[in-house]
Amino acid sequence: MANPVVAIVGRPNVGKSTIFNRIVGERISIVEDVPGVTRDRIYSRAEWLNHSFYLIDTGGIDIGDEPLLVQIRQQAEIAIDEADVIIFMTNGRDGVTAADEEVAKLLRRSNKPVVLAVNKIDNPEMRDLIYDFYALGFGEPYPISGAHGTGLGDLLDAVVRHFPKGGGQEYEEDVIKFCLIGRPNVGKSSLVNAILGEERVIVSDIAGTTRDAVDTSFVREGQEYVIIDTAGMRKRGKIYESTEKYSVLRALRAIERSDVVLVVLNAEEGIIEQDKKIAGYAHEAGRGVILIVNKWDAIEKDDKTMVEFERKIRDHFPFLDYAPILFVSAKTKQRLHKLLPLVRLVSDNHAMRVQTNVLNEVIMDAVAMNPTPTHNGRRLKVYYMTQVAVKPPTFVAFVNDPELMHFSYERFLENRIRDAFGFEGTPIKIIARPRK
C-alpha cells in the first residue's frame, strides 16, 4: 500500500513552510518573509497516529502573470493533483483576502478533501479571528500557530480522517508487481507499450490508490503481472516532465507498491547523477532491481561497447552489484523477450527462503575458509544463522558480540550466500544479534 499524500496549499506568506517543518520535525523548506520563496515543491515523509504519509510544501499561489508566479501556480496545481488530502493554509491576522478566495476556487475544482487551517493564531484571544474563514466554504477552520506549534494535533486528526480506507488496490500474493522508474525521456512509456503491445490477452486498467494512478494487469505464459502506475508514466507536458520532485514522489509511491523495480537508463545519454539517485530509492526500499538500458538501437556499437557500458554501470552503481543488466530497445523490440522472464526470476529470488541446515553448512564453510575478524584481542564467533524474512531475504546471524561484525565480513558472508543460493536481482540483509 502506498502512503497517502498531503499537500499544504495557500497564497504566499501564510506560513506554509513553517507548518511543514513543524509537522515533519526538520527544517527542510527555506523560510523567508518574502512572498514566493518556496519555489519548488518540497516533500518529506511524516507520521501521525500510526499513519505514515508524504507531505508536500508548495509555493504560494499568487494570481498574476509574471513567469515565476505562473510557474509557482502550475507547481501547486501538480501538488493538488497528486494529493489525497489538502491543507488549505490561511493567515488569521490578515483575514480572508482576495488571493485566499482565488485559491479556494482552485481547490473546489479539484474535488479533493480540504482541511482549512488558519495560521498565526498565537494566543487564545486571537481565536475569534477564525470565524470569517467559514465564508471560504470548507467547513470548520482549525486555528494553529506555526510560531508555537499549537493546534497541529487537531489539524492532523482532521487530515488523517480523510485518508483512503483499506489502502486501495491489493493484489493476490502470486501476482508479480513491477514498476519502471527513471528520469524523463529514458523511454519508460515506450517500454510499457512495447511490453503490452505483444499481448494477445485482454489488458485491463485497474484504478490504484490515488485518483489517477492506474495499474495495468496482464497475463504472460500463465503468470499474472501488474505494471504499477502506468498513468504516472503516461503523464505528459513540460511541467510534469521538468519537475523532478513530482516524478520522484510518484516513483517513491510506485516503488512502495512493487516487488521488482526496473531502473531505466538511456543508452544515448549515458549515466548521470540523477540516475544514481533514482536507483538508490529502489535499493533502499529493499525491492528486487533490474537495470534496463533502453534505446540500445540508437548508438553505434562494436564488439566492446556492451562490456564497456556494463563496466560504467557497475562503477556508477556499486550498491547494485546484485542487479542484472538488460540492454533493450523499445523501438525495435531488441531483447524484449528476455524482460519478463527476468522480472519473474528476480521476483522469485526476492521471495526465496533457504533451509536453515543448508544455510548453516554454507556459513560454517565460509568461516572455515576466511576466519572471523578480531577487535581489541576479541574474535567474532558466528554460532548459527537463520532466515527471518523475505522481500527482501533477511538473515539473522547469532554471534558472541554484534559489535565485532565488521561490514567487510558481513559483505563476505553475503557473497558466500549469493554464491550458494543465487539471489540475483535482490538485496540481502544480514543482522547480527547476540546469542541469548
Swiss-Prot record:
CDD domains (alphabetical): EngA1 (cd01894), EngA2 (cd01895)
Binding site for GTP 2: 182-189, 229-233, 294-297
Top-level taxonomic group: Bacteria
Domain EngA-type G: 4-167, 176-351
Stretches assigned to the KH-like domain: 352-436
One Gene Ontology biological process: ribosome biogenesis
Pfam families, alphabetized: KH_dom-like, MMR_HSR1
GO MF term list: GTP binding; ribosome binding
Keywords annotated in UniProt: GTP-binding, Nucleotide-binding, Repeat, Ribosome biogenesis
Role summary: GTPase that plays an essential role in the late steps of ribosome biogenesis.
Family of the protein in this entry: Belongs to the TRAFAC class TrmE-Era-EngA-EngB-Septin-like GTPase superfamily. EngA (Der) GTPase family.
Family annotation (NCBIfam families): GTPase_EngA (TIGR03594), small_GTP (TIGR00231)
Protein name in UniProt: GTPase Der
Gene this protein is translated from: der
